[in-house]
């Protein structure tokens, strides 16, 4: 992220032009404001303190939901949402950097500097979403961005536009109250894909090219975890094993070498490996079991049943706990595939599509302790310490930049990527309060005993 202030990459204009559809200026449907008034009543904003406005938090989340930012879509995926957020951050007086992390994939980073020296805390999130699928499977418009019965509804409401709105307004609240150190607010591209935004951010941080940021001492990833404080996350490996033989007529299979039986042998070997890993390491108390799951098989032409294929490729989704060394596991699987191919007279190629190691931030790390304190301050109860079943951008920030991360955000763990996605307004506001308290604890130190 070269340069300073509001910068660009790949020719991006430093200051986005106003959106012709009114993204930056148009209000959310008036029903949202009315519903908020009814839902929040006299407490509207009171629980957030004078530094923040409850309605503004939900209004921003609703605006973001109304923007269709599907990560598999053509062209500029995050652009409209990034433009909205960048404009708001500039209004707050932050130093703003907008970059194209990959072609058509926009990220925005806002930096807020305190009034005295101190540590640097990062809030991190994303605005790309998975597809809504068949709209007929929804009972409402997937991009409604409305509040009904105390719930903000629509694709991306829980995962994780509510979390983005909460972290932006939490940082603003801390800014207005004064603080030590620095807050970095990063909305990074392509989390639902290969996490290209987080990878680019980590590279730029290592190169020292992020304006105003020379280090980051802790990261709060604002993904939906049902209000649990999650310092651990499963690792993930996306793997393809391609066996290569020789094509032949189905009537004369001896004229070729069929790779499909080798796939069957590999499937059995994967099951054996999973059994050994589970027997050796057991279930993780917060993450559950290690899983090696075959997900895709590509071989032959479905219209040519009489042709023996030359190649067969197996895709495997692997989920690990901190007990598993990915390098050792991948070496074992490569040896296994090689033996199977040799015995069958085949060629083989093992491709690691992506390798995301587990995250295991110590509970006594200051960023975890700050988030625990923030939850306690916001809710009056101790937080449940949990684990993230999938990978987040925090996985990449830990792997590539060595950053300590903890995941905490509004919305249920299991509602993401489903039809009729929603998040409770009360949970959005509780998360905002928790972020404010966590940031103050991390940056200023714990409050003095009364």
Regions found by a protein language model. Give the residues of each.
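Acidic-glycine-rich active-site phosphate/pyrophosphate-binding loop
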Residues: 132-147, 216, 231-242, 406
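Short, conserved micro-motifs enriched in small and acidic residues
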Residues: 152-165, 172, 191-192, 257-260, ...
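Short beta-strand segments
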Residues: 124-125, 186-188, 220-223, 242-244, ...
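Acidic/histidine-rich catalytic neighborhood of metal-dependent amide-processing enzymes
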Residues: 160-238
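Hydrophobic/aromatic beta-strand patches that form the interior of the parallel beta-sheet core
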Residues: 97, 119-123, 186, 218-220, ...
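Phosphate-handling active-site elements
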Residues: 148-150, 170-185, 212, 270-280, ...
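Metal-dependent amide/peptide-bond hydrolase catalytic core
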Residues: 2-4, 43, 47, 76, ...
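Acidic/His- and Gly-rich active-site-bordering loop/insert found
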Residues: 2-5, 11, 21, 25, ...
């Amino acid at each position: 992220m070269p340069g300073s202030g509001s910068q660009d990459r790949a020719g991006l204009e430093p200051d986005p032009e106003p959106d012709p559809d009114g993204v930056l200026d148009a209000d959310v449907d008036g029903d949202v404001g009315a519903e908020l008034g009814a839902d929040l009543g006299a407490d509207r904003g009171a629980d957030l303190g004078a530094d923040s406005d409850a309605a503004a938090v939900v209004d921003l989340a609703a605006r973001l939901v109304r923007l269709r930012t599907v990560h598999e879509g053509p062209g500029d995926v995050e652009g409209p949402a990034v433009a909205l957020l960048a404009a708001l951050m500039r209004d707050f007086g932050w130093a703003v950097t907008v970059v194209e992390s990959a072609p058509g994939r926009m990220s925005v980073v806002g930096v807020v500097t305190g009034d005295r020296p101190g540590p640097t805390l990062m809030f991190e999130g994303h605005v790309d979403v998975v597809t809504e699928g068949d709209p007929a499977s929804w009972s409402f418009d997937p991009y409604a961005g409305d509040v009904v019965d105390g719930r903000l509804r629509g694709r991306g409401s829980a995962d994780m536009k509510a979390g983005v709105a909460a972290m932006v307004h939490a940082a603003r609240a801390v800014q207005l109250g004064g603080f030590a150190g620095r807050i970095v607010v990063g909305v990074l591209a392509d989390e639902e894909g290969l996490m290209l935004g987080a990878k680019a951010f980590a590279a730029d941080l290592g190169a020292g090219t992020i304006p105003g940021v020379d280090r980051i001492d802790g990261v709060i990833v604002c993904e939906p975890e049902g209000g649990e404080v999650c310092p651990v996350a499963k690792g993930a490996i996306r793997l393809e094993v391609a066996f290569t033989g020789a094509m032949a007529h189905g009537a004369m299979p001896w004229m070729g070498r069929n790779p499909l039986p080798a796939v069957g042998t590999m499937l059995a070997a994967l099951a054996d490996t999973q059994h050994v890993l589970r027997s050796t390491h057991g279930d993780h108390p917060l993450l559950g079991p290690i899983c090696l799951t075959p997900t895709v098989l590509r071989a032959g032409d479905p219209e040519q049943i009489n042709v023996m294929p030359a190649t067969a490729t197996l895709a495997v989704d692997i989920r690990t706990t901190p007990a598993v060394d990915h390098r050792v596991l991948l070496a074992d699987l490569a040896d296994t595939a090689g033996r199977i191919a040799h015995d069958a007279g085949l060629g083989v190629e093992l491709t690691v599509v992506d390798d995301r190691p587990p995250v295991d931030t110590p509970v006594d790390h200051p960023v975890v302790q700050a988030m625990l304190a923030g939850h306690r301050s916001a809710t009056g109860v101790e937080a449940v310490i949990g684990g993230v079943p999938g990978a987040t951008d925090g996985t990449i920030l830990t792997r590539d930049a060595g950053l300590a991360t903890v995941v905490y955000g509004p919305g249920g763990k299991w509602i993401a990527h489903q039809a009729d996605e929603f998040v409770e307004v009360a949970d959005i506001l509780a998360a905002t309060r928790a972020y404010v308290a966590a940031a103050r604890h991390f940056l200023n130190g714990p409050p003095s005993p009364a």
